[in-house]
Every structure is written in structure tokens, then in C-alpha cells.
Design a protein with these regions (language model features):
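A short, basic/flexible loop-to-alpha-helix module at the beginning of a structural domain
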Residues: 2, 6
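Acidic/glycine-enriched connector segments
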Residues: 10-134, 141-144, 148-163
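Low-complexity, Pro/Thr/Ser/Gly/Ala-rich linker/spacer regions in secreted
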Residues: 164-168
């Protein structure tokens, strides 16, 4: 009962989760948003490209103008209020790029280890401090950290969870494009 009461406090903590649809942390974030009834969306590469082929159609995401993962990452960081990176240090590959993009777009970012549940109160405080309504969630793909999807799912469920009777129905994102910055001009 104690954990159910605790999770109810987090109801409405963020209005929307965005992510890029890659295996691992990205899909964990989208799955948790769907499960908890939190609005979700984000950008995926053109053609819905991902390491396992294509991003499943169940995730309603906008396709970036290119198939480049870096362009998708930049758009998701740009369109968020802040980025939560769920990863063990040191950051590598696309996860390191996400941190660079957060710095470039001057968006708050926070790196958390998904196995350290004690960080949840700190993350809640950080979300409130920065008045985060649209949260970009990023981290390693499954092939880089085999258990990262499961760990991220558990972490995000504890962070954003709510009692079943307070569960909202997620608004499915529309396919309508928001403004797309000329991603070809972005320098990484």
C-alpha cells in the first residue's frame, strides 16, 4: 500500500514523454507512457529505421526528414523541455550525442542509473525544478546493454507510476508534423 500511495503522488508529473523508438530505453519509455496513460510521441528516423529493422507501428511517432539517427535525436531534444538519460556511465554512441544535443539546445538533462532506485526522489525534484512538461527519455539501445530495456521500464514505472484508478487514457499523437528545423544544417 505504501508504494501505491507513493506512486499516486507522481500522477501528472509530466504531460508528455517523447522518445525516438530505438530498442532499449527509447521503447521502454514509450511502453511505460502507453501503460500509464501518459501522452507520448517523438521523432524516429525516416523509414522508421531502428537496429531491429523498423520501429513498430504501435508507436505513433513522426518520421524525421532523414534516416540519420543524429537528426532524430536533435529533433527530440529540441522539442522537449528536458532530457532524462537512463544509462550507466560512461555515455557512448547515440546516448553521448543526446547529452551533446541537450547542451546545444540548452535543455536541462539528467543522467540516471536505472539500477539506482534511490535517485527517484532526486529526479522528481529535478522535473519540478525545471517545470518539465515534455520529457525526452533516452539511453542505450538494447544491443549495447542487454538488460537496459527491462531496467528502464522498471525505473520509469516507479518514477511515473500511478494507481490504476487514476490512470488516464493517453492521447494518441497525430501524424501532423510540427515545424522541422533544417536538420541538414545541424552540426554534431
Amino acid at each position: 500500500m505504501k508504494s501505491a500511495a507513493k506512486s499516486a503522488v507522481n500522477a501528472g508529473l509530466v504531460d508528455k514523454i517523447i522518445s525516438g523508438g530505438q530498442t532499449g530505453v527509447d521503447r521502454a519509455a514509450l511502453d511505460v507512457a502507453i501503460e500509464l496513460g501518459i501522452n507520448y510521441g517523438g521523432w524516429c528516423p525516416l523509414g522508421r529505421r531502428s537496429e531491429d529493422g523498423v520501429v513498430p507501428e504501435k508507436y505513433i511517432l513522426q518520421e524525421a526528414p532523414t534516416a540519420n539517427y543524429a537528426d532524430r535525436t536533435a529533433l527530440n531534444v529540441r522539442d522537449s523541455d528536458a532530457t532524462l538519460i537512463i544509462a550507466k556511465l560512461p555515455l557512448r554512441s547515440g546516448t553521448a550525442l543526446t547529452q551533446k544535443m541537450a547542451d546545444r539546445y540548452r535543455r536541462p538533462s539528467l543522467i540516471v542509473d536505472p539500477h539506482e532506485v534511490v535517485t527517484i526522489p532526486n529526479v522528481i525534484e529535478w522535473l519540478k525544478k525545471h517545470n518539465v512538461k515534455v520529457l525526452n527519455v533516452a539511453g542505450p539501445r538494447e544491443s549495447l546493454r542487454h538488460d537496459v530495456g527491462v531496467a528502464a521500464t522498471q525505473y520509469l514505472t516507479q518514477l511515473l507510476g500511478r494507481q490504476p484508478d487514476t490512470k488516464r487514457t493517453a492521447k494518441r499523437p497525430t501524424a501532423k508534423n510540427t515545424s522541422v528545423e533544417a536538420v541538414s544544417k545541424l552540426r554534431y
